[in-house]
């Protein structure tokens, strides 16, 4: 096979339907838009506008509250950390902090900190320093002979 022999699979690339090109095309005159009215013109309608009727987004009550100082943690699972330890990208003999986790490529960003969850198996004896961890993640690391130190004050209080 050569570059000049490459082709799309049959039916993969559909040809654009050219409209308003005479009655023989099947899409002549009104080009499949019907007759007159706002929808037959260019620009069509504004999303959410219901012709003067009170729109749905205004008929329903406002709900909820967004905390202005909410912390957003990057989630990392134990199984993924173990995978990086096995691959040699994280050194289990050294203390592992959030910067080491990001540098190894376990997660691309740490946002307001890293929260460790217990999904997956952990066999390496790790010393982790992170912003948060689930109770089951703390138990799993301690069972493997390691330890987790929590840096976020709220997370440290909730894990105890």
UniProtKB/Swiss-Prot annotation:
Composition skew (Basic and acidic residues), residue ranges:
1-13
Q: Name one GO cellular component term.
A: large ribosomal subunit
Where does the secretion signal sit in this chain? none
Please give the positions of the paired cysteines in each disulfide bond: none
Q: Name one Pfam family in it.
A: Ribosomal_L27A
Task: Identify the stretch(es) annotated as Disordered.
Answer: 1-51
- What keywords are annotated for this sequence in UniProt? Ribonucleoprotein, Ribosomal protein, RNA-binding, rRNA-binding
| A Gene Ontology BP annotation from the UniProt entry | translation
Q: Which PROSITE patterns match?
A: RIBOSOMAL_L15
Keyword Kinase on this protein? no
Molecular function in Gene Ontology: rRNA binding; structural constituent of ribosome
Q: Where does the record place Gly residues bias?
A: 23-35
User: What is the role of this chain?
Assistant: Binds to the 23S rRNA.
Q: PANTHER family given for it?
A: 50S RIBOSOMAL PROTEIN L15, LARGE RIBOSOMAL SUBUNIT PROTEIN UL15M
How it assembles, according to the record, is:
Part of the 50S ribosomal subunit.
Recorded family membership: Belongs to the universal ribosomal protein uL15 family.
What is this protein's name?
Answer: Large ribosomal subunit protein uL15
């Amino acid at each position: 096979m050569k570059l000049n022999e490459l082709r799309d699979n049959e039916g993969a690339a559909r040809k654009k339907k050219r409209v308003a090109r005479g009655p023989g095309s099947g899409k002549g005159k009104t080009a499949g838009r019907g007759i007159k009215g706002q929808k037959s013109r260019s620009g069509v309608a504004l999303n959410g506008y219901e012709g003067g009727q009170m729109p749905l987004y205004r008929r329903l009550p406002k709900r909820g509250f967004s905390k202005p100082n909410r912390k957003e943690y990057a989630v990392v699972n134990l199984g993924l950390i173990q995978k990086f330890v096995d691959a040699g990208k994280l050194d289990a003999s050294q203390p592992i902090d959030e910067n080491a986790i990001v540098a190894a490529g376990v997660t691309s960003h740490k946002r307001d900190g890293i929260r460790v969850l217990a999904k997956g198996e952990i066999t390496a004896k790790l010393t982790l320093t992170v912003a948060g961890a689930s109770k089951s993640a703390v138990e799993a690391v301690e069972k493997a002979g390691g330890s987790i130190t929590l840096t976020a004050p709220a997370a440290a209080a909730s894990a105890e």
